[in-house]
From Swiss-Prot:
Intracellular or extracellular location(s): Cytoplasm; Nucleus, Nucleolus; Nucleus, Nucleoplasm
Identification of the protein by name: Partner of Y14 and mago B
Coiled-coil blocks: 132-171
GO cellular component: cytoplasm; exon-exon junction complex; nucleolus; nucleoplasm
Biased composition (Basic residues): 90-103
GO molecular function: ribosome binding; RNA binding
Gene Ontology BP annotations: exon-exon junction complex disassembly; nuclear-transcribed mRNA catabolic process, nonsense-mediated decay; positive regulation of translation
Xref: PANTHER family: PARTNER OF Y14 AND MAGO (PTHR22959:SF0), PYM PROTEIN (PTHR22959)
InterPro entries linked: PYM1, WIBG_mago-bd, WIBG_N_sf
Family per similarity comment: Belongs to the pym family.
Subunit: Interacts (via N-terminus) with magoh and rbm8a; the interaction is direct. Associates (eIF2A-like region) with the 40S ribosomal subunit and the 48S preinitiation complex.
Length: 192
C-alpha cells in the first residue's frame, strides 16, 4: 500500500487519513528524499537473488511440455508416490520399528517405564554413602571458600590503597565475614 502524497507550494505532505475509529490524522510534512518504510526495497543477498532469478523449468522446456511430462510420469506404474519413496534406509528401518511398537501394544511400554522407575529408587543409600562424591564436594567447598577469601583480601587492599574511597554496605559486610570464612576454611581443611 503506497502512502498518499499531496504536493502544494510549501512542499510535500502525507495526506490526512481517517483512523478505524473515525478520527482523522493530521497531514504530515515530508522532507525531500524521504522514502516511507513500506516503499524501501527489502535487502536480498546474492543467493536469494540467484534463486529468485532461476527458472522453474530446465532450459529449453516450455510450461506445456512440463505438464505433458508430469502426466507421462503419473502413467508409469513404478513411479507411484508412496510415503517411503524419498526416505533413506535408516528412516525406513525406523518407520518399521514404530509400526512394530504400535502392533505390540501399549502394555510393553508401561512395563519398561515401571522397570526404569524402580531401578534408580532401589539404591539411593549407595549414592549418599559414596566417599569419592563426599570428597569431591568438600574440595568444591574449599575452593569456593578460598575464592571468597581472595575477594575479601583484594577488597581490603583496594580500601587501603585508596582505590575505593567509600565502601558500600555490602563491601563492609563482606569484610566483616572474613574471619568466619577463614574459620570455615580451616575446619574443612582439617576434616579432609
Amino acid at each position: 500500500m503506497a502512502t498518499p502524497y499531496v504536493e502544494d507550494e510549501s512542499g510535500k505532505y502525507i495526506a490526512a487519513t481517517q483512523r478505524p475509529d473515525g478520527t482523522w490524522r493530521k497531514p504530515r510534512k515530508v522532507k525531500d528524499g524521504y522514502t516511507p518504510q513500506e516503499e524501501v526495497p527489502v535487502y536480498e543477498n546474492k543467493f536469494v537473488k540467484f534463486f529468485k532469478g532461476k527458472p522453474d523449468l530446465p532450459p529449453g522446456m516450455s510450461p506445456g511440455d512440463e505438464a505433458q511430462a508430469r502426466q507421462q510420469q503419473q502413467g508409469i506404474p513404478g513411479i507411484a508416490e508412496s510415503e517411503t519413496a524419498g526416505l533413506s534406509k535408516t528412516a525406513k528401518r525406523n518407520m518399521k520399528r514404530k509400526e512394530k511398537r504400535k502392533l505390540q501394544g501399549p502394555d510393553s511400554n508401561v512395563e519398561a517405564l515401571i522397570n526404569a522407575v524402580e531401578m534408580p529408587t532401589s539404591n539411593p543409600a549407595e549414592a549418599t554413602n559414596d566417599p569419592s562424591g563426599a570428597a569431591a564436594e568438600k574440595a568444591k567447598k574449599i575452593k569456593n571458600l578460598k575464592k571468597k577469601l581472595r575477594q575479601v583480601e583484594e577488597l581490603q587492599q583496594k580500601l587501603d590503597s585508596g582505590e575505593i574511597k567509600q565502601a558500600t554496605k555490602e563491601q563492609l559486610d563482606k569484610l566483616g565475614r572474613a574471619k568466619a570464612i577463614q574459620d570455615g576454611l580451616l575446619q574443612l581443611e582439617e576434616d579432609s
